[in-house]
């Protein structure tokens, strides 16, 4: 019996999670890294809901993020998962969640009760909701994954992205992330991958064939492009890229 799309995606995500856990200690040895946690482990109950609820609407365009931030996917297990967006747009329901061992003491894991809202995630899901009108229509057109699921933080709590780390440190994890990306594309029959930022686009270009690859500006408040004209230019760019 052939597994459903959601079951195949969950299997792929669990394989990725296991591979990332195996590569965690290598990342922790780097001088810029103090804490590494895996939302696919401690927030699996949220991520599983995301896959079960929204992967079966036939989307053929994949929006590809980079890795979690401390106030988004780190809390909700959902890419760009600002807690209000996860509750109100994605209809993610409460699950008990505990701060995992190895978490940064200044970046506690509170799950859906986290009051601070990730700006990137708020911008990201808000534009999709405004453009498509309903969550069902969003996921009839697009699906979303992060390339890497690990939250990587420095001693002060600064977010460390995969691009900040040398190849020798991050490569084993990135290879697993590449395999996962290819699996998602194959399972869903994805025809277009849109990198949210140039890093994600480059990862897609390095490992994917026979799909159209593009990019959109990243919604991070650290990006001048995302903030230009009060965010209007970013919104216009996003709408010009999505189907």
Where are these regions (language model features)?
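Active-site metal-binding loops of divalent metal-dependent hydrolases
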Residues: 67, 198, 219
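Short hydrophobic/aromatic-enriched beta-strand-loop microsegments
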Residues: 211-218
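A polyanion-binding, active-site-adjacent surface
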Residues: 3-192, 201-202, 207, 224, ...
């Amino acid at each position: 019996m052939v597994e459903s799309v959601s079951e195949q995606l969950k299997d792929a995500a669990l394989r990725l999670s296991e591979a990332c856990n195996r590569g965690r200690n290598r990342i922790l040895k780097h001088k810029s890294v103090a804490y590494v946690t895996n939302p696919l482990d401690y927030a699996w109950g949220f991520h599983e809901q995301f896959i079960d609820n929204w992967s079966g609407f036939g989307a053929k365009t994949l929006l590809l993020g980079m890795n979690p931030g401390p106030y988004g996917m780190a809390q909700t297990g959902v890419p760009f998962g600002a807690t209000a967006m996860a509750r109100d747009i994605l209809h993610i329901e409460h699950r008990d969640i505990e701060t995992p061992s190895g978490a940064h003491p200044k970046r506690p894991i509170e799950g859906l009760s986290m009051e601070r809202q990730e700006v990137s995630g708020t911008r990201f899901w808000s534009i999709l909701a405004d453009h498509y009108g309903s969550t069902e229509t969003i996921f009839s057109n697009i699906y979303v994954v992060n390339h890497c699921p690990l939250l990587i933080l420095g001693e002060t709590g600064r977010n460390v992205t995969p691009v900040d780390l040398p190849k020798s440190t991050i490569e084993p994890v990135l290879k697993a992330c590449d395999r996962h990306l290819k699996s998602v594309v194959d399972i869903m029959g994805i025809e277009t991958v849109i990198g949210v930022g140039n890093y994600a686009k480059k990862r897609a270009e390095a490992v994917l064939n026979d799909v159209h690859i593009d990019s959109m500006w990243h919604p991070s408040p650290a990006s001048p492009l995302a903030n230009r004209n009060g965010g209007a230019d970013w919104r216009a760019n996003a709408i010009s890229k999505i189907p």
